[in-house]
């Protein structure tokens, strides 16, 4: 695979991430010795809503922290455009009759057999004549490798012009996809890759000879229309990745539709999204005519394996004391503690450090790569406590997490219970068939009301726990 300056940027990005994982993140001193604390500026209290991370950053974070595919047990639902055509899935990559150099690339990446989404999507994407596809797939399910394989399979290496076009919401996400193209195509040196991203300056009137172009909607639109670097009528495969992230960004939706309208009728359209809410579905139907559809039926998250308690407190300091009592009485392998604001999270991490706990702090102010490094350290057990705001409520599976503590209960911007976030938060424990423990700190009439409404929503009783009673705490550990 060619390595122009933008391809090199991919390697640099990867190297930066690797070095970040080994980085001892320097902490500001919080008085004595604060083990593993990353002190963040807290000039003003941030509300939970402000703290909610933008989707692109969350998506990038998920890519950086995934070392392997998610073991997904969800059922795949396939809706075919033509219900009379035979439906089949594959259990091995050999069944797809790939070009030998592509099969070699797939195996070199560590894929031994297709993932659940690949089993169903690849036969559709590689079918003749080409078929359009809308697919729902979370991070870590192998969907990037699937559409990259489809693009590489359609390319005619002897034709030196763009034949496959892939849109990503951000420069960083484009680089991540580019990295997969580089890896899978490394035994196919005739294939070249170009990045249509802001900052990649080309001479006006210049024609691109690379067969695959990956970029962000605004730049790709310029390259197709204004600058004429790409002849859209020669594009065979159009991929729109992370559609849910794309439509959350001002202007990207319209730009993507304008690009799609320039493409030939027989161009294969592939769209991927982690979620399928109405806005994404409407957008998908505008850009992908006559599609096959693959949906991952979401596994119902359950509270059945999680013991839930609440602790009555009257102040922040009392909540902290209750936390210390809990730690003093039971053995906790690893814990995640959720706070409402960055300021509280920073304060709590510092206080826990003073008590001698190995603490990591995760906050929206940190760079995505920094966050990935913190999560990796926690996953490796270098820190036993992860204090975080909502930034990290989803997508992080750490097998050793046995306790989740809601230092503050999750509420939406209107102050109502955020039931979905509650479920995702305490779902960090009780995974992998183990029993988990969730403890909720309640410090006011308002938070008691929130807790009662959460109980009603899930139809699950949350028991009161007296953290001053050592015997009672020891009982919950058994």
From Swiss-Prot:
ATP binds at residues 118, 137-144, 428, 431. Its main location: cytoplasm. It is found in: Cytoplasm; Nucleus, Nucleoplasm. There is a cross-link at residue 26 (Glycyl lysine isopeptide (Lys-Gly) (interchain with G-Cter in SUMO1)). Residues 124-294 form the Helicase ATP-binding domain. Residues 2-299 are annotated as: N-terminal lobe. Residues 300-478 are annotated as: C-terminal lobe. It comes from the Eukaryota. Its EC number is 3.6.4.13. Residues 305-473 form the Helicase C-terminal domain. The keyword Cell membrane does not apply. The N-terminal extension helix acts as an autoinhibitory domain, preventing ATP hydrolysis, unless the N-terminus of the protein is displaced by RNA binding, allowing cleft closure to bring key side chains into position for catalysis. This is ATP-dependent RNA helicase DDX19A. It comes from Homo sapiens. The gene is DDX19A.
């Amino acid at each position: 695979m060619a390595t122009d300056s933008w391809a090199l940027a991919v390697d640099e990005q990867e190297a930066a991430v690797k070095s970040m994982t080994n980085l001892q993140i320097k902490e500001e001193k919080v008085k004595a010795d604060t083990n593993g604390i990353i002190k963040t500026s807290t000039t003003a209290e941030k509300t939970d809503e402000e703290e909610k991370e933008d989707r692109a950053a969350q998506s990038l974070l998920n890519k950086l922290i995934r070392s392997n595919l998610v073991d997904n047990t969800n059922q795949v639902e396939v809706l075919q455009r033509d219900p009379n055509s035979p439906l089949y899935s594959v259990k091995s990559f050999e069944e797809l009759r790939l070009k030998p150099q592509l099969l070699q690339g797939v195996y070199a990446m560590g894929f031994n057999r297709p993932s659940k989404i690949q089993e169903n999507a690849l036969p559709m994407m590689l079918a003749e004549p080409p078929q359009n596809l809308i697919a729902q797939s979370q991070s870590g399910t192998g969907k990037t490798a699937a559409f990259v394989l489809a693009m590489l399979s359609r390319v005619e290496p002897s034709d030196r012009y763009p034949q496959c076009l892939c849109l990503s919401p951000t420069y960083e996400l484009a680089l991540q996809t580019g990295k997969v193209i580089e890896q899978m195509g490394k035994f196919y040196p005739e294939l070249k890759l170009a990045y249509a991203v802001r900052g990649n300056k080309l001479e006006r009137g210049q024609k691109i000879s690379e067969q695959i172009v990956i970029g962000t909607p605004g730049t790709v639109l310029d390259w197709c229309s204004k600058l004429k670097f790409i002849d859209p009528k020669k594009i065979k495969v159009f991929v729109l990745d992370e559609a849910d992230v794309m439509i959350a960004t001002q202007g990207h939706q319209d730009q993507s539709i304008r690009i799609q309208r320039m493409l030939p009728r027989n161009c294969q359209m592939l769209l991927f999204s982690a979620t399928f809410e109405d806005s994404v579905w409407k957008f998908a139907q505008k850009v992908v005519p006559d599609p096959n559809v693959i949906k991952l039926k979401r596994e119902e998250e359950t509270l059945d394996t999680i013991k839930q308690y609440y602790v009555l407190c009257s102040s922040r300091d009392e909540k902290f004391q209750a936390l210390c009592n809990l730690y003093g009485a039971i053995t906790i392998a690893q814990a995640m503690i959720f706070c409402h604001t960055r300021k509280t999270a920073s304060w709590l991490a510092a206080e826990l450090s003073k008590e001698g706990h190995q603490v990591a702090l995760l906050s929206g102010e940190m760079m995505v790569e920094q966050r990935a490094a913190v999560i990796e350290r926690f996953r490796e057990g270098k820190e036993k406590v992860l204090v975080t705001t909502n930034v990290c409520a989803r997508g992080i599976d750490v097998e050793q997490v046995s306790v989740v503590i809601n230092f503050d209960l999750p509420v939406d911007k209107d102050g109502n219970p955020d039931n979905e976030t509650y479920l995702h938060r305490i779902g960090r424990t009780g995974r992998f068939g183990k029993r988990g423990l969730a403890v909720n700190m309640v410090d006011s009439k308002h938070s008691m009301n929130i807790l009662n409404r959460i109980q009603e929503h899930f139809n699950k009783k949350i028991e009161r726990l007296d953290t001053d009673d050592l015997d009672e705490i020891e009982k919950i550990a058994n």
